Amino acid sequence: MRYGTLGEEINTTEVTDEFETLQTIKRTKQNIVGWYFYSFSSEPFVVSAIATYIPLLLEQFARHNGVTLEDHSVHCTADHDKCVLGLFSNRIYIDTSSFALYTFSVSVFFQTLVVITVSGVVDIWNTVTFKRNVLLLFGIIGALSTILISRIYNTQYYMLAFLCILSNSCYGVVNVVGNSLLPLFVSEYLQHNSSSLDERDNVDILTTLISGRGASIGYSSALVVQIISIFLIKKSKSSENIQVATLFVGIWWLIWQLPMSWLLQDSPISADVTPEDMDNLSIHKPKKWIFKFSNLKHGWSSLFQALKHAKLLKDVVIFLVGWFIVSDSVTTINSTAILFAKTELKMSTLSLIVLSILTMINAILGAFTIPQFISRKFQLPGEKLLIYIILWASFIPFYGILGFVFKNIGLKHKFEMFITAIWYGISLGGLSAVSRSVFSLIIPRGQESTFFSIFNVTDKGSSILGPLLIGLITDYTHDIRYSFFLLFALLILAIPIFHLLDVERGKKEASSLQKIPIAD
């Protein structure tokens, strides 16, 4: 029998270690591709369906079942400017535009409850495989409920509202769990890429790069969906048939999430991996699957624990307060502008979809160029970049306010809406990419789902307030233009808050909290 020398054994070990490293890097790159599919499959829902189709459908259903503002015995038609919808056996009447805003506000409320509950369970079984299964489960439910929207009659406005709430709640879970994977993949890639370990800034660069690409891919898929939707609507029996577009969005979401089932996998555990590494990487050994109802409260207890240690998370608190205001106003700008264009400027459904397409194209441009070129060229840190994007976005409601002063400018004509869509798209894409990357840098490792659920509370949960206030303003004035005052004030208010944000200090805060156990 021949025994190898000590040198041969060492070489064999080195080859084995190198092979394991290459396999892990390969798996990480595959996971990143799978993460792109999460954005590619689900983004058309929030960008196309929630932002365009469903608000129009809600207003359309409300108008079909509504009456005129002046005389509640007269059925509302497309020729009437001001219509109201009777709810709860006509006990109360609301503006037909407000029905869409109130429904969205309620949907975000339920979305917030579901997201916090589910994210805690995800953090307990903190593996890529488990998170993938959660993504697929809620993605399938959300996609099917979106498809069902296309099958209801225009008299079923309560059912439409219910399906909107269900699908939006499912998307919230998909969004939070999907975003929580980003810092795991970045840490894992840099952990096994020796050429990058000497540069601390590579975490920031890689996070921003992947986040920007994900946002661009998501908006690109939404753009494709919008273009195909125009063709489908033109081929349908009615040019106002928006339900065929929601059908296509649901099918798109259902099909394109399937590649995640084989792309998102746990990486193999190397023999030299330390427990500290396992806390940061997506290579956790799965816990034994024993579900307890007590696990459902883990997200809430984790949330309260995180808030309890807010003194260690000064910059996270600053970010969330600022983002609560910005997300509320920017999200509400879209639904307000769509309803404004339809009710005040009388734009057709196809024209409104074109507006959405222009928004998507420029959102892709903003998500791609702002993090990768503008940020690098001018050496702008993420917190400063956010301030400039907010200033850019604030011009939209300001221009709408000018309509009270001037007769011919200030969103008085249809062509102005197309210019506004371009302007809005750039700000939307930039905010989407930069906000996720900045937040992922200042949260503790191993608690991504919980903290991204907090991010979702501010990102989506703030949308409870915005549409509610706009709905109340519209119900009181029956003129949605007045809502631009509120939107402009909110954006300006956020600027001094983000001026206080310090990302480098936030990283140290996150490292401190990472050492404090979160209660189960």
Curated annotation (Swiss-Prot):
Domain of life: Eukaryota
Membrane topology field: Multi-pass membrane protein
Keyword terms: Amino-acid transport, Autophagy, Glycoprotein, Membrane, Transmembrane, Transmembrane helix, Transport, Vacuole
Keyword Transmembrane in annotation: yes
GO BP, one annotated term: amino acid transmembrane export from vacuole
GO cellular component: fungal-type vacuole membrane
Glycan attachment positions: N11, N193, N280
InterPro entries: Atg22, Atg22-like, ATG22/LtaA_families, MFS_trans_sf
Keyword Transcription regulation assigned: no
Compartments in which it is found: Vacuole membrane
Stated role: Vacuolar effluxer which mediate the efflux of amino acids resulting from autophagic degradation. The release of autophagic amino acids allows the maintenance of protein synthesis and viability during nitrogen starvation.
Family: Belongs to the ATG22 family.
Protein name: Autophagy-related protein 22
Organism: Vanderwaltozyma polyspora (strain ATCC 22028 / DSM 70294 / BCRC 21397 / CBS 2163 / NBRC 10782 / NRRL Y-8283 / UCD 57-17) (Kluyveromyces polysporus)
Classification of source organism: Eukaryota, Fungi, Dikarya, Ascomycota, Saccharomycotina
